[in-house]
Amino acid sequence: MLKKKSILIFTIIFFLNTPSLLANEKLKIIENINNIKTLKFNFVQISFDKKENGICFLKRPHFLKCIYEDKNKKELIVNRRNLVIYHKRYNKTYYYPVSKSYFIDILDKKKFENLILDGNLSLNEEIFKIKYSTENKGEIIFFFNKENFNLSGWEIIDLNGNHTSFKIDNLNKNQNLNNKLFSIPEIN
């Protein structure tokens, strides 16, 4: 009988403390994110059943460039308020509103912090997941390494129900990145 009471008390204490434990983990993630000025990483992206990979460079608060290893030599560039897909092979540039994407939220430390604080945190054996959704952008799930709190990827479900998975590997923090790297190519 005493053993059952002990287990019951432990279970109650554990579940009462779980929200504060998760809040503490969110703060550790935010602290890690706020210490990042630049990132360089390899990625694997899966969208529309197509797997793509490449390398990305991120410089806060305004810049992101992902270079895809594909035949079109595609580049995704976020440069302040512009979101551009550039096909180097064809010298074609396509502009999109960055306001309808989560990139602006990831690049801005305060906005990213708010996504983390307002999102629902869950964990498994290896990663923390933070799920956040909004009416005008859809849903995003961020993945963070459980050991070092590094961003390890995200999954987006857009307003049309399309899934995009983005996995990060070989993450390097706070390297010098020249702003020229994020220039939008001029069309000839």
Model-inferred region functions:
Residues 1-8:
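Bacterial N-terminal signal peptides that target proteins for export
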Residues 9-17:
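Bacterial N-terminal signal peptides
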Residues 21-23:
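Boundary at the C-terminal end of the N-terminal hydrophobic targeting segment
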Residues 31-51:
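A short, Trp-centered hydrophobic/proline-enriched beta-strand micro-motif
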Residues 43, 64-68, 83-86, 130, ...:
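Short hydrophobic/aromatic-rich beta-strand segments that constitute the beta-sheet cores
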Residues 56-105, 164:
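An acidic-aromatic
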Residues 89-127:
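Flexible, surface-exposed loop/linker segments and immediately adjacent secondary-structure boundaries
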Residues 114-188:
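Gly/Pro-enriched, hydrophobic low-complexity segments
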